[in-house]
């Protein structure tokens, strides 16, 4: 299919153009999506050696993508963004409120920047608008911390500022063509859209609603599953799953988060061992850690209900922060017998609660 409100790729890339493909966090089917896009470049006048794929985090997903690209396109470059490496960052401009916009240097220097991102919705924690997944993911550590603080703001000012910064960054980078991957409720791909501007945003939002909308139904027990890969991006998925579950659970009920996360509790989350919520919240905000968002959401959630994790994490660490631990599905099944009603949310990090 042709891009939405945009010319074919062959008419927008020219000989000598350097191309940066910015891969956002937790894009389902990312290997296949990137390979498909690179194959489209074979029909253009661009040299494959002038294309670099940039990912926001290192880890298993990044390694698999690098191998997939190398097996098909040996001359295509691959880079893992480092928010702490000043040499790998470039000053783009100042934001509307005067904050410096520092962005990955490869993106800044490229003639053509094409982001590949997961479509998210307005109710998600940290949603940054149509170009969600561009920054703070590909910015410096200071910007990432500033965005975390804005996400935790209680009013709408933080969200407006974040989205404004992201839009401005996309404009300054000269981004025209974008690829949006619409997830389904079980972590797969519902559809893939490409194009430019508001028409792409509208189409992507409509596709996401069709794929992930759920009518809210209150229950004393909510079981929320989240997929994805362990890493900095996965903490945001956990936070979104917890946030979605909070809209379905009854007061003083129980939320069980099912995750494939197999690592120790993060630095920010450890501060939840402080039972004084105000003190814990302050320490979390000062931590500047990737798990800051999930820590703040768990702090909010524990004031509403009891929380259990069923994951590969350590039981002692979870219990220290006031979270119950379910070793396997059988323990969850036993928990279900204690309640007369249960809501199960598959892909809770992507669920869109809507009124029936």
Task: Tell me what each language-model feature is.
Residues 238-356:
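C-terminal non-catalytic interaction/assembly regions of soluble proteins
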Residues 20-22, 114-116, 221-225, 256, ...:
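Structural motif
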Residues 76-218:
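Conserved, well-structured core segments that form the ligand-binding/active-site neighborhood
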Residues 17-28, 52-57, 223-225:
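Short glycine-rich or small-residue beta-strand-to-loop segments that form or flank ligand, phosphate
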Residues 67-89, 278-293, 302:
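A glycine-rich helix N-cap at a beta->alpha junction
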Residues 48-59, 80, 180, 254-260, ...:
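Short internal beta-strands
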